[in-house]
């Protein structure tokens, strides 16, 4: 195969040299480089077919909460497909475009993470080459012709190696075979034997449960090349968006057709370079070479399965793939974190670290040193990897990777030692304790993914107590749910008797000043100081003072000093872990810390024995602490912004914050208006954008009384008290004539804060409600969460605008009116629950309610008009007799009932039953009995008799009723209706 494809590549280069000035491949006498393949694709569509080249979107989805990562080239064009694109935007002018899109499939519906490394083809990061035609710019014939031209004439792939597939149709949904596409391929010279048809699963593409969709045609490459049975791999998928899937599952033709194509660059390059694996191409060879040069292992040889002794080649593939994903994601602003896409990225990083250290024997800092290699191979195509801007410098990416790598290496080493020590104590048939595994995991703060813990145990032939682990996971989920609001689950506490005993024993209160021992590095990262302490007292889970605790016990610890922030002042407590001095392999996860009478009680899980008098080292969870610091500084800015907006007398009535969100209660006479919410956010954004320094200093409590406008709560403060001032040094704020507290945020606060406001990033108020009269509760988020909320809000605004335009155009089609009403209803439901700016929610709710009223009014008018028209037609046909039993065309049961009512109103002596067959095969039924009918003749019984005959059901009252059924013999149903009525008259 390699020789054949190499020859094809040679013909390709010669053809380009003679007649294709829009793009040249490398002049080397070997298959083209991957970069040249990418460039040839883009140049072909730009120069030969007039496509506009657009940059790759960020791998972080913009305004699309349904995705963790961008996983296809079409993601950034969703607004066009959905009709929600801003008409004033650049995208609205797109007609034919092409690009190479960065894609990540490592979470959610499309997840290739676990397969990476095990075979020769899967990747978490890949490049998707694509071309698009919007609004019918071109369609099937042109798309197929362009694809065939590129593959056979530009890339020089032999035509007899290419197979194509098309949609075979689906009788259940009424979709015809895509014979047009079949005939196009035949006209291009593809033999009928290589034109295959498949059904919905293979050749019908859908964006989701609802939305644009359509048949697709795939181009496959035959790896066998005539040497035995075909071995087909998909090269290119061409989607023809011509339908729209409604919420009820029905399909309708789109008013405008679109072309959406996608071809994986890595697989295409493998074909053109004559390789059986994407990892054998020059897209990966520089990385594989760099890995080999840094590690004491044999060079990569492409083995899989049992042939891959020691899993060395698997590790090569894992590391090469994952470092590409990490570099691209971090450059696009997605860093390893604790939830959502950042959590997935953290798992990818730690998976790469484990394979690099345990299998490849890589030195410290190994992964970070690979980042420049990634930039060298991808930087020309994606300049954001090289730009000198925020968070995208090569050294910043490498530094971030290296820091997390170093932290995880330390965690892995501790984890291995803990596993080894625990396994030695197990009997032959004992299960590995779930509590110990949990303490090693991400949830237990050591940060080793549970699947890696299980893998390490499997290597030792030890089984994990999965049932116990599931119970712990359920408890953790419940615990997190309860912590979403201020109240955490009740934990250990020191009652008055315990405190009295501590004082009697002369045990001093806890020195927690080390919690403020942190600094800001020049690169913008925070460094938290180490804290060493002594265990002064231990408590069992029941609260009893004990001299020691054993393995697997939940306990409380009192130390002489701590760097953990104990929950107070509305700020959630720190999390983290402690280790015994001199025994670095034993980790004690600390779930929370709380202050009781000056004593800081740490709640921890003991993986093994701990005694009073032991010396320990404490480590706070940096990500959790940073999240709290961001939210706390943001809370102060929010308080200041509220005073700026509502007046200097505005009072705070409470707050609570954790890394996920903040809650703020404020005294207000009336709920905040939409404009006030918007103004509050703008004040905070201004302060954040100015990146003001945050000054913190302890001063005598008496001195704070002379600060005009000081923000303080009605509570007892320590003396001296800590003053937190934004933008103004504390000494200046304390000056007698200072007006600082009237112009910026100055508060008494013992919490932990940022050292400058810029790290808040952004603040969005996502909810407000009246707790009681005069007190409003605000919910807010910051940073990337806030930015995403704004993007979702903007996307929602565009959808509302589209709905408004549809309503303004009007329609005589009742089904379309009902669809629009349902669409507006769905927007109303989404607006209620979506995480978007609250001011925007209020605006859109007002607009949508108005649109819903207009839509319902339009429906009622259409139904009344149709009912009047239908009833008049029926009266002409049934002017005499006691009965009207007939069929009529009605688009809904509501219309049918209105027709019956109007008939009975105009002919009160007649009893009426109407049937209306529907396109779906169902039959609607409505009836009303005449005034003065016999008592035994009821509408409900009449409808039930007819609908039962049709295998359906009915409901209603003695006077009027309705129902549904299914039948192919309407005349028989009508005869049943007449016979029943005549028998009752």
UniProtKB/Swiss-Prot annotation:
Subunit (UniProt): Monomer.
Upper taxonomic lineage: Eukaryota, Metazoa, Chordata, Craniata, Vertebrata
Entries under SUPFAM superfamilies matching the protein: Class II aaRS and biotin synthetases, Putative anticodon-binding domain of alanyl-tRNA synthetase (AlaRS), ThrRS/AlaRS common domain, Translation proteins
Native source organism of the sequence: Rattus norvegicus (Rat)
GO cellular component, one term: mitochondrion
Family: Belongs to the class-II aminoacyl-tRNA synthetase family.
Record remark: domains: Consists of three domains; the N-terminal catalytic domain, the editing domain and the C-terminal C-Ala domain. The editing domain removes incorrectly charged amino acids, while the C-Ala domain, along with tRNA(Ala), serves as a bridge to cooperatively bring together the editing and aminoacylation centers thus stimulating deacylation of misacylated tRNAs.
Protein name from the UniProt record: Alanine--tRNA ligase, mitochondrial
Keywords for the protein's UniProt record, in alphabetical order: Aminoacyl-tRNA synthetase, ATP-binding, Ligase, Metal-binding, Mitochondrion, Nucleotide-binding, Protein biosynthesis, RNA-binding, Transit peptide, tRNA-binding, Zinc
Gene name tied to this protein: Aars2
CDD domains: AlaRS_core
Catalytic class of the enzyme: ligase
